[in-house]
Amino acid sequence: MSKIWRRMEWLRAVVVAVICAQWMASAAIAQNYPLKPLRIVVGFPAGSGADFIARMVGQRLAGFLGQQVIVENRTGAAGTIATGVVASAAPDGYMLLQVTAAEAAQPALRSRLPYSLERDFAPISLEAIGTFVLVVHPSVPARDVRQLIALARAQPGKLNYGSSGAGSSPHLAAALLQQMANVKVVEVPYKGATESVTAAVAGEVDFSFPSITAALPLMESGKVKVLAVTSSKRAALLPQVPTVSESGLPGFDRSTWHGLLAPASTPKEIVTTLNALVVKIVNTQEMRDLFNRQGLEAQTNTPEQYATLIKNELAQVTKLIRSTGAKTE
């Protein structure tokens, strides 16, 4: 009995020693962080909204940290290539992921993702919220969302909309519109957002959901009619335009968001440091103005709040995509 007891005590001591060593190593890494340049991996090309935010935040992070912050574009597979790279990176705070709400659609669209957005990442902070605009071709006899819904109900399956593919923001916005209004409209997929908006201007489709910056010149030139914005509150660039929620579908909200993630198991001290800096950077008037000109609203939160946002987004988007039956593989 005493021999077994001694062995148990020895094993307990080993476990405690290992835990202490890991904690001390983690604390030492965090205390000296950063000792080399950081990388922010972006799953979209240079010039995209995600790339813009990564570069604006990265430049200012470099100033605070005293180390270069390199933005690395790893495009392809709707951003999942970049996400996979960061998911498998060392959890030391030197490789971060610039993520968008589009990532939340991928688990429902792809059956063999090599990572989990919840399990394999440590949220740092939200950076910005964006909205889309519901626009219709001038020939569509609808002046507001209520009239568009009435048209869709009167002619089930006749109205169509342009999207940039399964899981895209227009696709999800239309799915939510159909679900909440109990109507049926037809998706016409295009290769990208530009093509889907061009189709709405040309009258190839009845309506679409472009970004604010894409919609503004079209609205001002009379090429489309703007009915509403898809976010929960009115947009600063279009304060006169109501939300879909105000226009007959209370609770409607299909915003997009941008934020930073680190690999799971990144030391909490590093996550806390990065969160504090991102919050400080994004909430300056300079950044608010920069984001606003891009149709974005600067917004930050805690790592815990960001984790909750991601969890809720995954649940809502998965439900929406399943309702459409969409799949990319």
List each model region and its residues:
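N-terminal secretory signal peptides that target proteins for export/translocation
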Residues: 1-10
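Bacterial N-terminal signal peptides
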Residues: 12-25
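Hinge/capping helix and adjacent helix->loop/strand transition within the periplasmic-binding protein
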Residues: 88-93, 108-195, 244, 257-290
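Beta->alpha turn/N-cap motifs
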Residues: 98-103, 163, 193, 210-215, ...
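Short beta-strand->loop
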Residues: 114-126, 162, 184-188, 206-207, ...
